Amino acid sequence: MSNESTNDAPPDDDPDDPEPSVDHDDTDGLQDDPADSVDDAGEVDDLENLGSDVGVEGDVSIDEDNAEDDLLGGLRIDDTSDITVPDRLVDQVIGQEAAREIVKRAAKQHRHVMMIGSPGTGKSLLAKAMSRLLPKESLQDVLVYHNPDDSNEPKVRTVPAGKGEQIVDAHKEEARKRNQMRSFLMWIMILLAVGYALLIATPARPLLALLSAAGIYLLFRYTNRGSDAMVPKLLINNADRQVAPFEDATGAHAGAMLGDVRHDPFQSGGMATPSHERVEAGSIQKANKGVLFIDEINTLDVRSQQKLMTAIQEGEFSITGQSERSSGAMVQTEAVPCDFIMVAAGNMDAMENMHPALRSRIKGYGYEVYMDDTIEDTPDMRRKYARFVAQEVEKDGNLPHFAPDAIRELILEAKRRAGRKDSLTLKLRDLGGLVRVAGDIARSEGHDLTQRSDVLEAKKRSRSIEQQFVDNYIQRRKDYELGTTSEEAVGRVNGLAVMGGDSGIMLPVMAEITPAQSQEEGRIYATGQLKEMAEEAVENVSAIIKKFSDENMSEKDTHIQFVQAGEGGVDGDSASITVATAVISALEDIPVAQELAMTGSLSVRGDVLPVGGVTHKIEAAAKAGCERVIIPKANEDDVMIEDEYEEQIEIIPVTHISEVLDVALVGEPEKDSLVDRLKSITGKALDSASDSGTTGGNPSPQ
């Protein structure tokens, strides 16, 4: 398929022939070769073992009898140096069973994939692993030639990998020989002209000789400049590549992703650079027959997304100048092959800002997959987490190996961060950061191995911004005595919230009942920058208030304040039982214990529903000095608080609002009367509430 039209050769006085970009992971080609499937079948089958059933323990023994109770899954090691780290990237993937199955199918069938999930769950790792297991295509080089019919539309040719360099070298050698011949003829003519001028018997013969030599030199120098354009440019060089390419176009501008044509400041006077030499390949051309990975796909501008759609649909894309002010905007090559597998990634908001047609292309020619945040806690998975620690140590290269107790503490932290019973977190990037901080501490302390104490210290030093903010907030509350100094208060309840997903904070809620301002009905006024979900939770609480109260609520206004909620406001429904308790306390004038905090969602029938982040909320209550905390019964097994807090706080699981009031309110005669009245109205006895359990429902994100 090579273009052998080399009728003219360029002169050798233009040494600045631009070199093509070849120091990237480029694999480009034009045509599918069915013969490749025979050699590639075995490699695609390797995807069956994509991070699953890997011998993470190498030659180390496993105590199967104690595997269930051991945080190492029965692994018997002296330190992480005993654990064999797989050489292949695919074998280092942990969890994400559904995503691995999708990746396997996409690699076999050449399908696009969109991965949506939280940061640090392995999206880029899976994409890179997929590229290394793609079938080996017949790699090709891409050449760009001058178009004699239209210099602004360079021709594109493909040749087998390695042939591109040979063709360019052959063109350059021919140009060099032709240049030598032109130089030889030029000097012969200059000598003849000078000799003839000197033979003429006139006073001006020296000047005539000089002018003759200069004229001949300029004639040879600036004529036949078109021969320069006959040397093609090697746009993509795959001479040394043996595997499919992986191109990361995350955050790339239009020129870097789609290809570009450089601006030529000298466009006339014989100084112009041929248009084909100014063509530069983009990520989509370099990713031909490989994987194009784009993280945060929604951050691409609409114009780039539209052109990406065209490339996906057609499998080829012309390169043109991306800046309308550049001379390259007038150049447009023939179509360059870009038959890639696109792996798009992003968080949940990616789908909102993503071009609908681009998402439709991916769905029409591929798969969508949601990345898991957690995975079931099993002995085998714990052993893989131990291998993960060994991988991080080997990858960093400057960390001391981890002792077994340090690995156990890291696995325990993975359980805590999961926020669910019998689960481990799959946000391994954050966990890897903790591994590196612990290793740095161990090295600074002069430890041969990273110990459990180093991991505990790392947890303190590697706190998130939200955790540091919460600690400062608690200290400010103490400094300015923002917390109540009494043991009980009417209409005031200590609620609990989560910031940033891994930091709990105590958020007091106050309620007050006043005569209605409107003559038609009583209203609920909630302040604290409540968001939509929190506002709906307040409305649901009002149903319970109206149901049990003897008061005519149409004649009263209910004021609810989330004290010092901050600029971020309040979202989620986990403060439902807090709001209900505060309003009931204010309405009935019954005080609430102030050494108590609570969290939980609430149904309109009074059932307490599960919420998220319960571990972080309990720890926040303990830090704030609370002695007791109320949580939903359904979250009881999700609690994974640190050892230092277990003796500081009592955890009280509940299933119904009547249980909440029985624990939170003080003043026996008034409280008992209120609770009994609530039981009779709701038809739910306190004694039978624990047997009936919860009514279900999904955990709140807050």
UniProtKB/Swiss-Prot annotation:
Annotated ranges, domain Lon proteolytic: 487-667
UniProt EC number: 3.4.21.-
Keywords per UniProt: ATP-binding, Cell membrane, Hydrolase, Membrane, Nucleotide-binding, Protease, Serine protease, Transmembrane, Transmembrane helix
Protein task: ATP-dependent serine protease that mediates the selective degradation of mutant and abnormal proteins as well as certain short-lived regulatory proteins. Degrades polypeptides processively.
Family statement drawn from the similarity comment of this UniProt entry: Belongs to the peptidase S16 family. Archaeal LonB subfamily.
Active site per database record: S574, K617
Major subcellular site: membrane
Protein name: Archaeal Lon protease
PANTHER family for this protein: ATP DEPENDENT LON PROTEASE FAMILY MEMBER (PTHR10046)
InterPro entries in the record: AAA+_ATPase (IPR003593), Lon_arc (IPR004663), Lon_proteolytic (IPR008269), Lon_Prtase (IPR027065), LonB_AAA-LID (IPR046843), Mg_chelatse_chII-like_cat_dom (IPR000523), P-loop_NTPase (IPR027417), Peptidase_S16_AS (IPR008268)
GO biological process, alphabetically ordered: protein catabolic process; proteolysis; regulation of DNA-templated transcription
Regions that span the bilayer: 184-201, 207-223
Stretch list, region Disordered: 1-63
Extracellular side: 202-206
GO molecular-function terms, A-Z: ATP binding; ATP hydrolysis activity; ATP-dependent peptidase activity; serine-type endopeptidase activity
Mode of membrane association: Multi-pass membrane protein
Gene Ontology CC: one annotated term: plasma membrane
Biased composition (Acidic residues): 10-48
Subunit structure: Homohexamer. Organized in a ring with a central cavity.
